[in-house]
């Protein structure tokens, strides 16, 4: 398999998880599309390693591998196909590598929303630093933190909800009821903003819409329908 084929495979895997992007990326400048999907695909690889599956050990090993890979990117070396696009970007890859142990440790539920956000703050700050370089403009660490909380919820379901939310919903709640309550909290408190790079605004808007629909009863991983995606992405792109 060639490097180009391997890269296309990882990008394709991300697109399978986020089919909305085929509609939404029409609002992303053409010159930013390749870097956008590669960077989003890398983040998906990291969060799935941290929060995917029932056994955390394979994911911890994968995050350890990624820490070494990102250190290599800062020194001009790469092994992973996503590095074909991303390694040449002069972003703070070392900062992201250093934050991966925090991501690995974030599988356990936090006590409250504030604690959940604080637990992910180092990885959110690292992502924000890379966002600013990839998208050539200032990004917001609070928005990166909300993205991480949303991804954690979509991957872990009930297990992602802080203990405070579980106590509020009580015993005997329907399956994924705790997760739906947490999704409602996140979607209501995550305020859309007009600043930040356009690809990030669009992705955040789609995540908020997924959360809103899940809170209202949709399956947790169901994509946003195409017509709704078009409307949501257009509004986010306008700023």
Where are these regions (language model features)?
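Acidic/His metal-coordination segments adjacent to aromatic residues that form catalytic metal sites
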Residues: 101-113
């Amino acid at each position: 398999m060639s490097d180009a084929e391997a890269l296309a495979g990882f990008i394709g895997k991300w697109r399978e998880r986020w089919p909305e992007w085929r509609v939404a990326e029409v609002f992303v400048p053409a010159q930013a599309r390749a870097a956008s999907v590669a960077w989003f695909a890398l983040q998906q690889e990291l969060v799935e390693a941290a929060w995917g599956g029932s056994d955390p050990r394979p994911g911890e090993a994968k995050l350890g591998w990624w820490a070494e890979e990102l250190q290599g990117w800062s020194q001009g070396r790469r092994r992973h196909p996503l590095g074909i696009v991303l390694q040449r970007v002069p972003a703070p890859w070392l900062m992201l590598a250093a934050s991966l142990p925090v991501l690995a440790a974030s599988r356990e539920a936090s006590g409250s929303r504030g604690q959940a956000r604080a637990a992910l703050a180092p990885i959110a700050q690292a992502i924000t630093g890379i966002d600013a370089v990839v998208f050539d403009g200032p990004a917001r660490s609070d928005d990166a933190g909300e993205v991480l909380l949303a991804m954690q919820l979509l991957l872990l379901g009930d297990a992602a909800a802080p203990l405070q939310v579980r106590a509020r919903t009580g015993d005997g709640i329907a399956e994924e009821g705790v997760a739906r309550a947490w999704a409602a909290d996140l979607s209501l408190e995550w305020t859309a903003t007009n600043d930040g790079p356009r690809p990030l605004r669009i992705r955040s808007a789609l995540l908020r819409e997924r959360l809103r629909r899940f809170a209202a009863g949709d399956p947790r991983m169901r994509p946003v329908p195409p017509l709704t995606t078009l409307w949501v992405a257009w509004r986010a792109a306008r700023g």
